[in-house]
Amino acid sequence: MCTTFLSYKIVKFLEKQKIEFVDYPSLIRFNPNIPWKTRGNGAVRLTIKTRNPNKIKKEIIQFITNYSDTKNGANPGLVFFQDQSIPQSFHKFSKLALWKLISRKTAKDFISNNKIDSFYLGNGQGLVGAIGAIGYKFSDHTFELLCYRKKSQFGKKRIINKHSVKKMQSITFPETYNSFDNENDRVLITPHGPDPVFYGIRGESVKSVVLASTMVDTDEKLDGYMVFKSNQGTADHLKNELQVNDLKPYTSGFLVGKVCSKPVTEQGGHVFFSIQVGDRKIRCGVYKQTKITKIAQDLILGDKIHLGGGIRKASKNYERVLNVEFLDIIKLEKNILLTNPTCKTCNKKMKSKGNRQGFECFRCGNKSFSKSSLEIPRKIQRKLYLPAISAHRHLTRPYQRLKKRNKFEIFDTSLEWLNIF
């Protein structure tokens, strides 16, 4: 069972208890470049006031025990923290979890050293996300409305009116984003797996995603929805500058360097090249599904670029590579083509007389000792290039959010952030 649906069930339970919600449920995405399936890269934080914390803890632990799909590899983690403020150590842990690999041992040691009340099943990998979620500080945020199916519909094909989603996006954009792929005429709000989510709408406010949900047309009877405050769409994982002398596998971040090898298109349509950062050369890969391979192909030696992505571990057949998630061109070199000179009398290209012997016009005999230079116009520009929206990750900051920052959001209890149908 997915983390957000389990949170939805817990919130429905808490609504019936004598508790007070003091913030929206928070959905925090951590480092997406960690390879294992249950990797703690999505975690939910619930902040409440209660007079009976021990009872609430027992009930939530029971929810985790009853509904977690441990047989299929789930490793849920649960952390409880009671105080008026969050210690700096939690914030530091959370920042690291955004971009690096944090081991289960590190998480368990953190819990032990700080005497934290916790619970986990499986190998405890979920504790990484649980600690990180408590310590996470929003510097920007979006919202996602997740609408859930009834249990009888789990695993069945989702049937949604495509035109209603397309129209919804045209009306609500840019207050909502990445709902419909116009280029491929494809709905983006519905997942493809058997999970309980029917659709998810992302946007800038609770009002915008709730309004958008009223425009989505489907005949399926749904269970309800919950709105999460999230770091999705903020590129949180790419704010860390990678250290070229210590590029650890699965870390995320950015590098600034100069292209030092000609881009090569390999099998599958993926493009690889290297950049020079200080005295180190870093191999970079731009993949076909991002649809920015043509941009990568047009890079030349000396171009200064800013890249964000994750470090793929070296293997027997492949070397270590930075998997590119964005490509920002800072400076373009002039593309100079050296050619045989043109005879000023005959207006024809001269021919080479041999190595270091200059050039001669085969018609009139005029001579020249140097080649002519011709500047070829560049096909790419100094700008940021992002993948096609079909290849966006949860954390990808789309074009329309580049200058957008939602720093403050008062918890408005009058808004319908939870709705049980």
Go through the PLM ranges and name each one:
Residues 343-346, 361-364:
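Short cysteine-rich clusters marking metal-coordination/redox-active sites
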Residues 264-289:
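OB-fold (S1/OB) nucleic-acid-binding surfaces
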Residues 300, 372-421:
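Long, charge-rich boundary regions
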Residues 261-263, 308-317:
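Short, charged beta-turn/beta-strand-edge "cap" motif at the junction between a beta-strand
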Residues 249-269, 339-344:
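Structural detector for short beta-strands of small beta-barrel domains
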Residues 290-307:
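Short nucleic-acid-contacting surface segments enriched for D/E, G, S/T with interspersed K/R
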Residues 312-340:
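OB-fold/S1-family single-stranded nucleic acid-binding modules
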Residues 60-65, 70-244:
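Long, hydrophobic alpha/beta structural blocks
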